[in-house]
Amino acid sequence: DTDVEVIKPMNDIIERGAFMGCENELKPGGTSILAVAPGLGLGCIPRLGFNEDMLNLYAGLHFQYAGNDLNQKTVVEYTTELLVAKGLRNIDDIQCVNEIWIYPKEYFCPIDYRTNKMNVTCNTRSIHHFAASWKSWDEKMKIIIARIIGTKLTHILGNARRCIIGKK
């Protein structure tokens, strides 16, 4: 992505081989799954089979359906699903999947996009400033409200709103 700022050398990561990073972290007792985001930083090696698999996947996709509905699935979702099929585990640790090193959120994405709080650690190499230009106005407003009043209260208010107006 163009909104990524490199703050620390990545020589050790690059020397290790192909890599990508996660844009989220797992919360104790939570139900989230890792989301691997190539836009945070992507290191490749020649003839990496995973790249061919991704190209083959995209070659068969349609991004506009009959009736002009759009395929809204992101590269993060496609990448994560393919990595899960190849052995990605739902853990907050460095792991090697199909010759690709997958790094936890703290390495390439230290900002929590919901709260805008940054948690730079000794492992952080870059910062994804997360413009979220693809998100709808409603989704952007939810992020802004969550930053002001907190994610839990935003979730409660969102559920109440859906109950009142009858939307899922």
Segments predicted by a language model, with ranges:
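Glycosyltransferase-associated regions of secretory-pathway enzymes
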Residues: 2-168
